[in-house]
Amino acid sequence: VTWFASAPGKVMLAGEYAVLDGAPAIVVAVDRRAEAHLVDAPPAPSEFLSAAAAVVAREVGAEAAAALARVAVDSRALADRGLKLGLGSSAAATVAAIGAALHAVGRFAPEVVGALAATAHAEAQARRGAAGSGADVAAATWGGAIRFQGGRVTPVTLPPELALSFAWTGAVADTATLVAAVTATRGRPAVEAALLAIADASAALAEATTASAALTALAAAGRATADLGRAAEVALVPPSVTALTAALTPLGAVAKTTGAGGGDVIAIAAPTLVAPSAVTDAIIGAGLTPLTLAIDPRGVAITPAA
């Protein structure tokens, strides 16, 4: 192996559920990456790689499809002891795999990789009876912090005085099941009001230029997600997250579920003046596991093998 392609995982900070209606979502790429390279005897493809092969054959051609058929993907960094963390591993793997195939035939370009991966990932999800926003594919393609709305990607700069950290609930959430459960309650006034509040909070986070404004937006987003769960009668916010939120309030910090909620990764935001050890103590005290994660500015990339 002389090179490999890689793509980052993601955490959706705000805009969950509402993004499916065209509201903005704020998503950060994180430094757990899926890696892909070409091998002579690849393992059986996942449903996402099978969809990617079909899309690449259709849109790029037989040579690139043949390269993709030789791709092996390692996404173990996006899991913990075999349990998915909710970092968008299928999207990162799809982006990395297509990146590897296109690089192998001299056609690598992030915008092309991203477009093909978005189509492939959506087709694979549709076969499962699910529908995603595409935000995780966008984060894996472009890296950094982005505003994702209706398929459009805009870089955002989070306030430098805002410190982000992450924790794992210990519970694996099934995004498709949660989204279907919430979707089944659309039309209830309280559900629609919560979705509008999520959209407003996400837009406010995108425009925040100070840590105070960002924390206010994230707190509002967390409350709106809890309201959505109550209105839809779906368990979106685990009790441990409610406990952590209460413990962080005296520190001026905020915790909220990410993505579909129900488990997976929790985001914690605090002013940089707050001691990281105080945040870590609160995380552990609430029964959550601190995660070593940081925003990854790199999107899909080709790297020479060491």
List the predicted regions and their residue ranges.
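C-terminal nucleotide
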Residues: 1-8, 12-14, 18-20, 27, ...
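Short glycine/threonine-rich catalytic loop with a Thr-x-Gly-x-Asp
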Residues: 87-89, 255-262
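A short catalytic or substrate-binding loop motif that flags glycine-/basic-rich loops and adjacent residues
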Residues: 28-30, 260-261
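DPxDG-like acidic metal-binding loop motif
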Residues: 30, 84-110
